[in-house]
């Protein structure tokens, strides 16, 4: 978690307890005297105070804009989807967002838009960021 934290599923499902719990956790972590962090994912790191500060800044941005949190979650979840599936036809991703509850519900509840429109925006932003690539009409995770 050197550069942030994971998806806040509670908020995505309409339970507003996740962000306050994350804040309490980060504030408690900030009080600890830590020399090295050995995370469950990623390399060990020593700049603990900076990592907690980054996580708190990200949390503040999400508290100020639940839509930003939801968009970040959609990007992360779709990236993980592609890591599992390897590739998806771009033409079918809008339908996929409409069929998968988390994508469908977040599209409608946070953005008041149809899932296909949100899918198009998520794909475009991830392509622009270099996280995804387009190959022969398919969307793939970079490096796959």
What are these regions, as identified by a protein language model?
Residues 1-50, 54-63:
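Metallo-beta-lactamase
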Residues 68-144:
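C-terminal regulatory/interaction regions
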